[in-house]
From Swiss-Prot:
Membrane topology, from the record: Multi-pass membrane protein
Alphabetized GO MF terms: 4-hydroxybenzoate polyprenyltransferase activity
Catalytic activity: an all-trans-polyprenyl diphosphate + 4-hydroxybenzoate = a 4-hydroxy-3-(all-trans-polyprenyl)benzoate + diphosphate
Originating species: Drosophila pseudoobscura pseudoobscura
HAMAP family: UbiA
Domain of life, source organism: Eukaryota
Cofactor section: Mg(2+)
Identification of the protein by name: 4-hydroxybenzoate polyprenyltransferase, mitochondrial
rRNA-binding keyword on record: no
Length: 397
């Protein structure tokens, strides 16, 4: 017992001997021998050298198992990491698609404005929000259809669904939320616009399938992406003026075929290998000829829409600038250079903006033209009739 008491009193000098003595399960009395004997006749330095790594590892495990307080900002970092794949799924980091979807809506809203008036800012805000939401929903639908195809294409293999960052079930749940938000925006419009807007959903859903069956998926994309050319006018006026909206819509379809064909040339080698079709493959080396034809059709449609709306000089000047912009794109395009194709595709945001500004300025100028128009002269018969109406009737007494 003397040895035990001595060991307990001197544990700060012999930590490893104390650990060995106190953890022994034997019920036999402790022999009165020096502490060095209890641990196998090793010296303090020998014990420390052999057991120190084990003690350090044990301490590390205990410390790592203790709850640690979160660093400032760690919650935001976790939230960012959790939401980043969904933001990538709806292409928040690449807003060009939202712009290209919004501009036909903005054109239609601006064309429908009364002479001398600015376009309806509330409608522009609603359609801008709707473009952001529905473009994201369209990307989700596209990636759900093309998950296996995207995994085989160099440019798209890192997309959240193709790379496995998001499961198919989670993507469907996310799509439901997107469509619900889109419906919430749509119901802010009149009932004619609600029906017209809902009817475009079929095009949005079927577009990704078209690249499997036809070389013209860009045509279907154009029909879906430019639906706002019809919807914008209906939202502000309660009906669609086909004389103005139909040529505007067809112009937008031609524009989409132009810029999305340029876009599709980035992936044409991968598309050939996996059997995906596109206008880039259909046009081939004659791409510039085809794009020139669609550009001419677009400019013709825009001129027709402007004539139907009694547009003024700024509008037609903008149409001319748009034509020059597209001609420069096509002339300098290198269809075998993916970087150049991407650059030309992105520049189409400027096309939409230029035309929108031309519509706004042309509509504002319409009021001045109306005021400066000479009043029609009265004919002699009309003048005599007017004079007789202004004479006071005789009073019979």
């Amino acid at each position: 017992m003397f040895a035990v008491r001595h060991l307990l009193k001197s544990r700060k000098h012999f930590p490893y001997a104390y650990a060995a003595a106190t953890t022994t399960k034997s019920t036999l009395p402790m022999p009165a021998v020096p502490a060095r004997v209890l641990i196998g006749l090793h010296t303090d330095s020998d014990c420390r050298n052999k057991r120190l790594p084990q003690i350090q590892e044990l301490s590390f495990r205990k410390m790592s198992s203790l709850p640690t307080s979160k660093k400032p900002g760690s919650l935001l970092e976790e939230l960012y990491a959790a939401t980043k794949p969904y933001a990538q799924l709806m292409r928040i980091d690449r807003p060009i698609g939202t712009y290209l979807l919004f501009w036909p809506c903005a054109w239609s809203i601006a064309l429908s404005a009364d002479a001398g008036c600015w376009p309806d800012l509330t409608m522009l805000g609603l359609f801008g929000t709707g473009a952001l939401i529905m473009r994201g929903a369209g990307c989700t639908i596209n990636d759900l259809w093309d998950k296996d195809i995207d995994a085989k294409v160099e440019r798209t293999r890192t997309r959240p669904l193709a790379s496995g960052q998001i499961s198919q079930f989670d993507a469907i749940v996310f799509l439901s939320a997107q469509l619900s938000l889109g419906l919430l925006v749509l119901v802010q419009l009149n009932w004619q616009s609600i029906l017209l807007g809902a009817s475009s959903l079929g095009l949005v859903i079927t577009y990704p399938l078209m690249k499997r069956v036809t070389y013209w998926p860009q045509l279907v994309l154009g029909m879906a992406f430019n639906w706002g050319a019809l919807l914008g006018w209906c939202a502000t006026q309660g009906s669609v003026n086909l004389a103005a909206c139909l040529p505007l819509y067809l112009s937008g379809v031609c524009w989409t075929i132009v810029y999305d064909t340029i876009y599709a040339h980035q992936d044409k080698l991968d598309d050939l290998q996996i059997g995906v079709k596109s206008t880039a493959l259909r046009f081939g080396e004659n791409t510039k000829v085809w794009l020139s034809g669609f550009t001419a059709a677009m400019l013709t449609g825009l001129s027709t829409a402007g004539w139907a709306c009694d547009q003024t000089l700024p509008y037609y000047a903008a149409v001319g600038v748009v034509g020059a912009h597209l001609v420069q794109q096509i002339y300098s395009l290198n269809i075998d250079n993916p970087t150049d194709c991407a650059k030309k595709f992105l520049s189409n945001h400027q096309v939409g903006l230029i035309l929108f500004l031309g519509i706004v300025l042309g509509t504002l100028l319409k009021a001045n033209d109306t005021k400066n128009q000479p009043q029609p002269a009265l004919t002699s018969s009309a003048a005599s009739s007017y004079a007789s109406l202004t004479q006071k009737p005789e009073v019979l007494s």
